[in-house]
């Protein structure tokens, strides 16, 4: 007889600095209300994201009935990758009037290659268009 599947009681989505998860908000309260061992998650997350320090890494935590959990880390948000490629702190307050920076088509393709598993796109061209659109909505011009 196959083992019984664990019943899922919650799905938590967070964006946490890589290698820097701690029990303080937003991590503690989000996990605490589901009864998850917060320190156990923090240690596991920090170990899993150690190589990506400096990035914000989205994570999906699945909580089960017995208070155990599993988590899946995603790729860094496209907006953060675009800002880093453009070398600016934040996007434009008026994206279609005031442009704050420029990125090349090659940089867009590089970001699209990284983000492809998490994007709703089947090929690199479609992913590049999604990334270019995100850049435009942040007031960053795409050249090429």
UniProtKB/Swiss-Prot annotation:
Entries under Pfam families matching the protein: Ribosomal_L11, Ribosomal_L11_N
One GO biological process term: translation
InterPro entries per UniProt: Ribosomal_uL11, Ribosomal_uL11_bac-typ, Ribosomal_uL11_C, Ribosomal_uL11_C_sf, Ribosomal_uL11_CS, Ribosomal_uL11_N, Ribosomal_uL11_N_sf
PTM notes: One or more lysine residues are methylated.
Gene Ontology MF annotations: large ribosomal subunit rRNA binding; structural constituent of ribosome
Record has Transmembrane as a keyword: no
Record's keyword terms, sorted: Methylation, Ribonucleoprotein, Ribosomal protein, RNA-binding, rRNA-binding
Gene Ontology cellular-component terms listed: cytosolic large ribosomal subunit
Domain of life of the source: Bacteria
Subunit structure of this chain's protein: Part of the ribosomal stalk of the 50S ribosomal subunit. Interacts with L10 and the large rRNA to form the base of the stalk. L10 forms an elongated spine to which L12 dimers bind in a sequential fashion forming a multimeric L10(L12)X complex.
HAMAP family xref list: Ribosomal_uL11
Purpose of the protein: Forms part of the ribosomal stalk which helps the ribosome interact with GTP-bound translation factors.
Family per record: Belongs to the universal ribosomal protein uL11 family.
Protein name according to UniProt: Large ribosomal subunit protein uL11
Species: Streptomyces avermitilis (strain ATCC 31267 / DSM 46492 / JCM 5070 / NBRC 14893 / NCIMB 12804 / NRRL 8165 / MA-4680)
């Amino acid at each position: 007889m196959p083992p019984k599947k664990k019943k899922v009681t919650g799905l938590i989505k967070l964006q946490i600095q890589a290698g820097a998860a701690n029990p303080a908000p937003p991590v503690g309260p989000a996990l605490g209300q589901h009864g998850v061992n917060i320190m156990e998650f923090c240690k596991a997350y920090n170990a899993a994201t150690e190589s990506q320090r400096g990035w914000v890494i989205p994570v999906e935590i699945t909580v089960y009935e017995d208070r155990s959990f599993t988590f899946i880390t995603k790729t860094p948000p496209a907006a953060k990758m675009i800002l880093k490629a453009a070398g600016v702190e934040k996007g434009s307050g008026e994206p279609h009037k005031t442009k704050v920076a420029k990125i090349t088509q090659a940089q867009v393709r590089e970001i699209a290659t990284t983000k492809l598993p998490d994007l709703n796109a089947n090929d690199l061209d479609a992913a590049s268009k999604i990334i270019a659109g995100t850049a435009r909505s942040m007031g960053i011009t795409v050249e090429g």
